Amino acid sequence: EDGFIRSVGLGKYYIPPISLVFDNAGIYYDPATESELEKIISAGDFSDDDLQLARRLQDRLLKTGVTKYNIGQQSLPKSLLDIKEAGKKIILVPGQVEDDASIAAACEEVKDDFALVKAVKERDSEAIIVYKPHPDVVSGHSPASAHYDSIVAIDDYRVTEVNINDCLA
């Protein structure tokens, strides 16, 4: 499985990953089997040096803007920034490629982005919903949901070329 920091660009362009996840117990996104990563985190047996190293890595990733694919050059729309400044609740809904193994393994009820965005809106109808389709869908390398165009009726904003870090800030 691709690691949490993959590459500069998408795997569909045959750009090799710079990190991979190997786990003999299971994979982190499959709730049916506890992965080695989950066991390590659950045990919480970390030294002060481990925690300090993790904080330094996190700070460096945030400071340098590193993301999984390191793509997205546009800024958030000004109108969305104004909404954020006004204190209105904003929920980011990151899309997924619908034939991805994580969807099949982890989601019993939500099987596509339309169902995901709809469920989020139903849970919090007053929030501003920002939908970010998966980069492979945006690039045309993976098929969009059959209901992809219907998401427009539910989401308030759709951001495609914005860096994920800017969406989370």
Report residues per predicted region:
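Catalytic-core helical/loop segments in enzymes performing group transfer/polymerization on anionic/lipid-linked
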Residues: 1-169
